[in-house]
A protein has these predicted regions:
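Conserved SAM-binding motif I beta-strand of class I
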Residues: 107-112
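Non-catalytic substrate-recognition/targeting regions of SAM-dependent transferases
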Residues: 1-66, 75
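S-adenosyl-L-methionine
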Residues: 114-157
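C-terminal catalytic and target-recognition region of SAM-dependent MTase-like enzymes
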Residues: 193-255
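Helix-to-beta-strand junctions that scaffold the AdoMet/dcAdoMet cofactor pocket
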Residues: 188-190
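Conserved SAM-binding loop of SAM-dependent methyltransferases across substrates and taxa
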Residues: 93-106
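Conserved class I S-adenosyl-L-methionine
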Residues: 83-92
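Mobile active-site "lid"/loop adjacent to the S-adenosyl-L-methionine
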Residues: 153-183
Length: 255
């Protein structure tokens, strides 16, 4: 906290330590949540990213309440969204949904298992577009919903939570990634764009790519890689700690 205060000075109102849900597996650390310096009146605040507005609750939300490591990838979704019908699965608070709408999507559907998450996604859409944009939300299992969508969507985003937080569950996790991607690939419209991610540090980018290729074969679809994605430069990777490259993604064109 003191080091951050030295850098940011009076601009820094508070520092909140949120360790209880984020410490490494079996790290043996005494993780606690609470203020290290200062305090703010309300845990939910409005933030701005590339001109888009978001409500963020850093105390109760996942991790810091907003996934800053996906901001460059959200910008990429904005570039591809024009004229497309978009499905944002595991939407959390709707970051990708807001960017898709800003990019000119016809409509956006945001899906998450958490009722509170989809409420926040809807609030963030209204914060940016009022009631004018055709946005729907569903609080349900995203994998099950993918079975039902037919060929309604031509841009699908798969950004699930970490399926493998450690190597002991890696095999089951890869089967989960394969099923998820196969369902999306089998349903997306011809000419559609699939954004698919893994944030599991135990999953290498090579293993993730191979798993997605297997999913494409299962779905019987021909795909081309348009982009291979990673975390931004302010989430640097130590060359001696390859597991630090935890975020990997693919943008696929599906014929």
């Amino acid at each position: 906290a003191e080091a951050l205060r030295e850098v940011y000075g009076e601009r820094l109102a508070a520092v909140y330590d949120k360790s209880s849900q984020t410490v490494p597996y079996k790290a043996g650390l005494n993780a606690v949540d609470g203020y290290l310096m200062g305090k703010v009146a309300a845990p939910t605040q409005e933030v701005s990213e590339n001109g888009h507005r978001f409500l963020v609750n850093w105390e109760e939300g996942q991790k810091t309440g907003f996934f800053l490591d996906q901001r460059c990838n959200r910008e990429l979704v904005e570039r591809y969204a024009a004229g497309r019908t978009v499905l944002n699965t595991f939407c959390y608070t709707g970051g990708f949904s807001v960017y898709a709408a800003a990019g000119g999507a016809k409509e956006v559907c945001s899906v998450d298992a958490s009722e509170r998450a989809v409420q926040l996604a809807d609030e963030n859409m209204r914060l940016n577009f009022g009631d004018s944009f055709p946005h729907t939300t569903l609080a349900c299992d995203a994998v099950e919903y993918l079975k039902q969508i037919g060929d309604r969507y031509d841009l699908i985003i798969l950004d699930p939570p970490a399926f493998a937080k450690h190597h002991k569950v890696l095999g089951n996790a890869m089967q989960g990634y394969k099923r998820l991607n196969a369902r999306a690939l089998s349903q997306i419209r011809p000419g559609g764009i699939l954004f698919t991610f893994s944030c599991s540090q135990a999953v290498t980018k090579e293993l993730f790519r191979t798993t997605v290729f297997s999913a494409a074969a299962i779905a019987g679809r021909n795909v081309r890689i348009l982009h291979q994605l990673a975390q931004p430069a302010d989430h640097p990777i130590n060359i001696y700690h390859p597991e630090g490259e935890y975020l990997k993604g693919l943008v696929l064109y599906v014929e």
